Swiss-Prot record:
Its EC number is 2.5.1.47. Keywords: Amino-acid biosynthesis, Cysteine biosynthesis, Pyridoxal phosphate, Transferase. The lineage of its organism: Bacteria, Pseudomonadati, Aquificota, Aquificia, Aquificales. One of its GO terms (biological process) is cysteine biosynthetic process. Pfam families: PALP. Pyridoxal 5'-phosphate binds at residues 95, 200-204, 282. The gene is cysM. It comes from Aquifex aeolicus (strain VF5). This is Cysteine synthase. One of its GO terms (molecular function) is cysteine synthase activity.
Length: 327
């Protein structure tokens, strides 16, 4: 990009959603940029096998989870579940918690969250900054431990809490069905051939994938999971060894690619160094899956437009092993 073209973009030739004034921060959720990943890719990936990523860190809460958080809140309000004196509660690995805390602050609704104690310090501090109450659960139990903790609390105080239950709430995947999938189709002008996404609750891949399959049933929907039950890829679940999210249907996927923690970390760092895209480890996992897929297409002499989701930015992981001092 030339200096002139860069300045022209800054002066107003960028996309319409970023030019409009907004009455509330919540109206900035969605309509995130789609950017091509190129410079960090291995040399054996040809130009006609494209990899594109939705930069979900551009959401006001900093992650893809702003979409389902807002959707679940609005659904609960519409159904009359959130009333004066009620507290919204859920289990989270971090990003949904941040998003729920943000939405709660914007709407004036108190929020309580449970999450594993070993998540990054940044996530804990951001949640508290939004005014939410935080419970820390056994890190060895992962998000499953947080889920069980919340269930017990809700069972004990049913009149106090509105349990959004992101792992089983249809409003989660519908957020992507009515936003992310449409955005990707429009941004690629219908050229997308493969959609790749990490699996946590399953909301992103189920909602986006369902929408894309309506547009074009030939689009391949590919899930990304950690290779092992004990892993360091925050936000992703090893489904076989975890409490399976009720909204996730593995039979819907065309395939699943398993990623090791070290590869996820490596490619997250490469994205920052070479493409200037600063993301977390789940984005590194998604990219590594895309690279493996791109290599398969290249070997068969096929073209492709692979689109993935980079769930969040790297700011929340600066104190973790992801960005510890490495060359």
């Amino acid at each position: 990009m030339s200096l002139k073209s860069c300045l022209m973009w800054v002066l107003g030739e960028h996309d319409e959603p970023y030019r409009k004034a907004r009455e509330t921060i919540l109206k900035l959720v969605g309509n995130t940029p789609l950017v091509r990943v190129k410079k960090c890719l291995p040399e054996d990936i040809p130009e006609d096998v494209e990899i594109w990523a939705k930069l979900e860190s551009f959401n006001p809460g900093g992650s893809v989870k702003d979409r389902p958080a807002l959707s679940m809140f609005l659904d609960a309000l519409k159904r009359g579940l959130i009333k004066e004196g009620k507290v919204v509660i859920d289990a989270t690995s971090g990003n949904t918690g941040i998003a729920l805390a943000m939405v709660g602050a914007a709407l004036g609704v108190p929020v309580e969250l449970a999450m594993p104690a070993n998540v990054s310090e940044e996530r804990k501090k951001i949640i508290k900054a939004f005014g939410a109450k935080l419970y820390l659960t056994d890190p060895l139990e992962g998000t499953d431990g947080a889920i069980l903790f919340v269930r017990e609390l809700v069972q004990k105080y049913p009149e106090k809490y509105v349990y959004l239950d992101q792992y089983n709430n249809p409003a989660n995947w519908k957020a992507h069905f009515y936003s992310t999938g449409i955005e990707i189709w429009n941004q690629t002008k219908g050229r997308i051939t493969h959609f790749v996404a990490g699996i946590g609750t399953g909301g992103t891949i189920m909602g986006t994938g369902r929408r894309l399959k309506i547009y074009n049933p030939n689009i391949q929907v590919i899930g990304v999971q950690p290779a092992y039950p004990f892993h360091g890829i925050e936000g992703l679940k090893h489904i076989e060894s975890s409490i399976k999210p009720g909204i996730f249907d593995e039979t819907f996927l065309d395939r699943t690619i398993f990623v090791e923690t070290e590869d996820a970390y490596y490619w997250a760092r490469e994205l920052a160094k070479k493409d200037a895209i600063f993301v977390g480890q789940s984005s590194g996992a998604a990219l590594w899956a895309c690279i493996q897929l791109a290599r398969e297409l290249a070997k068969k002499g096929e073209k492709g437009v692979i689109v993935t989701v980079f769930p969040d930015g790297g700011e929340k992981y600066l104190t973790t092993a992801l960005f510890s001092d490495k060359d």
